[in-house]
């Protein structure tokens, strides 16, 4: 059966107090709307039809860029005359049969299992509503049942005292037979105080047509919470992060404090992984067995092999090229690994060392205050404190090659393109502009001069000019 998904995302989000469309505000590093679209794509939807309005062009451009493979379609609601009017805009894009699932673009945590169950409850024949049991249902429409059958949705302001005791609330999401949906939408009226077309009016139409109205319950309130303000967004972020932390810990990951953990992408972990507090993981991150992540690290798009230790305050950002850290490597504290860094087994990168677009073979070390850019570093190289590769000539980047067992003294500059042969030694303070032969000692610095009896200049103190009175 064909499944189309319609996502309402036209609202301005006034309470967000932001120029950005509400559905583009991020939860766990991805726009709210993207969470919903990704879930819909996971269901195998035939079409993902997003109804846009405020900031439509930005919303559409962003989603097409972020989800290039998804079966996206966009329709615009201009002006915005209610939820029923919104779904009416999707009618030309909908098929003639099957099921249409209607979701909200600012409700990002609906699980694929829940949406699948909702569509199954519809079965192309029934009107299925997604409901939830609430501790405080204030503001929600109540689900009034006659036995198991849904009889009506009663808004909070219209509910009787008895109906207000009902804890089952309507989430605003439903699954509808597509052919019936088109017919009911065509008959919507706006004879109400707001002069708007309400999607919920199709419930009465279904009952009048003898179509069964059923309900499927969400697993938790968190799953169906929407976002209308920065406070609600922050609260939902913490709920979502707590859920992700729980999943990881149930899989054996040791989080020292799950309340101080942020995952803004996808994280896969081997056995006996330990993660200290205030760490942020973005993009796609893989941690091998026995990896230890110290406090206050930020790691994005990286693969960290078994036994590696990432000390506190380390920043690893692979961007599009990624970063790889080999087995047993020691990184940090206060290290920075940038896109294209490929570190072999047992490599040491110490405090205030930056590595970009460079490979370092097994056992190479750069322990203090150094920069390696566009470099190939061989096994067991020792790269001294304060040393840098001068890889950029103002227009192009150039390669530095440091072969195995080279010792680079402190405060050296290697001006690329240049090759340091295997086993060579570079004296501290040298500026190397030519290739160095294997096994050679190369020293390129100004000669030290001593001046006997030299005295430092003394500061000249200006005399203050005085004024005489008369």
Describe the predicted segments one by one:
Residues 2-4, 30-120, 463:
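Conserved N-terminal catalytic core of the sugar/cofactor nucleotidyltransferase
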Residues 9, 52, 104, 131-132:
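Short beta-strand/turn micro-motifs composed of small residues
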Residues 1-18:
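N-terminal nucleotide-binding beta1-loop-alpha1 segment
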Residues 301, 307-470:
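Glycine-rich hexapeptide-repeat left-handed beta-helix
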Residues 265-302, 306-309:
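Phosphate-binding active sites in nucleotide-utilizing proteins
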Residues 57, 110-193, 200, 211:
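Conserved core of the sugar-phosphate nucleotidyltransferase
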Residues 167-270:
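Conserved alpha/beta core of the MobA/IspD/sugar-nucleotide pyrophosphorylase nucleotidyltransferase superfamily
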Residues 19-35:
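Short catalytic helix/loop segments, enriched in acidic residues and glycine
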């Amino acid at each position: 059966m064909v499944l189309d998904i319609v996502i309402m995302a036209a609202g301005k989000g006034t309470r967000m107090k932001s120029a950005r469309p509400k559905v583009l505000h991020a939860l766990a590093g991805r726009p709210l709307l993207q969470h919903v679209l990704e879930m819909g794509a996971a269901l195998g939807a035939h079409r993902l039809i997003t109804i846009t309005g405020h900031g439509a062009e930005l919303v559409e451009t962003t989603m097409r860029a972020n989800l290039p493979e998804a079966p996206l379609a966009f329709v615009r609601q201009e002006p915005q005359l209610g939820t029923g009017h919104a779904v009416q805009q999707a009618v030309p894009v909908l098929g003639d049969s099957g099921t249409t699932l209607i979701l909200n673009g600012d409700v990002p945590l609906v699980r694929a299992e829940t949406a699948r169950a909702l569509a199954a409850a519809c079965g192309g024949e029934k009107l299925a509503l997604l409901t939830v049991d609430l501790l405080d249902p204030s503001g929600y429409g109540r689900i009034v049942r006659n036995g198991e059958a849904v009889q009506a949705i009663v808004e909070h302001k219209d509910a009787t005292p008895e109906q207000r005791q009902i804890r089952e609330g309507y989430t605003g999401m439903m699954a509808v037979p597509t052919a019936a949906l088109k017919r009911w939408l065509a008959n919507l009226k706006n004879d109400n105080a707001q002069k708007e077309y309400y999607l919920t009016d199709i419930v009465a139409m279904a009952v009048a047509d003898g179509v069964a109205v059923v309900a499927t319950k969400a697993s938790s309130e968190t799953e169906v919470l929407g976002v209308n303000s920065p406070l609600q967004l922050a609260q939902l972020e913490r709920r979502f992060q707590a859920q992700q932390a729980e999943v990881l810990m149930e899989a054996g990951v040791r989080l020292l404090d799950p309340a101080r953990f942020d995952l803004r992408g996808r994280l896969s972990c081997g056995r006996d992984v330990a993660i200290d507090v205030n760490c942020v993981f973005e993009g796609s991150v893989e941690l091998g067995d026995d990896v230890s992540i110290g406090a206050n690290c930020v790691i994005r798009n990286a693969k960290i092999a078994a036994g590696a230790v990432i000390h506190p305050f380390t920043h690893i950002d692979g961007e599009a090229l990624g970063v790889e850290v080999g087995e047993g490597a020691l990184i940090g504290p206060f290290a920075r690994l940038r896109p294209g860094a490929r570190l072999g087994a047992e490599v040491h990168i110490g405090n205030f060392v930056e590595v970009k677009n460079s490979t370092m073979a097994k056992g190479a070390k750069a322990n203090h205050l150094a920069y390696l850019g566009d470099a190939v570093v061989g096994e067991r190289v020792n790269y001294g404190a304060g040393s840098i590769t001068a890889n950029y000539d103002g227009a192009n980047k150039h390669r530095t090659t440091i072969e195995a067992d080279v010792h680079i003294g402190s405060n050296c500059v290697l001006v690329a393109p240049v090759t340091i042969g295997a086993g060579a030694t570079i004296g501290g303070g040298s500026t190397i502009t030519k290739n160095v032969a294997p096994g050679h000692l190369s020293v390129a610095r100004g000669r030290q001069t001593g001046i006997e009896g030299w005295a430092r200049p003394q500061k000249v103190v200006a005399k203050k000019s005085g004024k005489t009175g008369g």
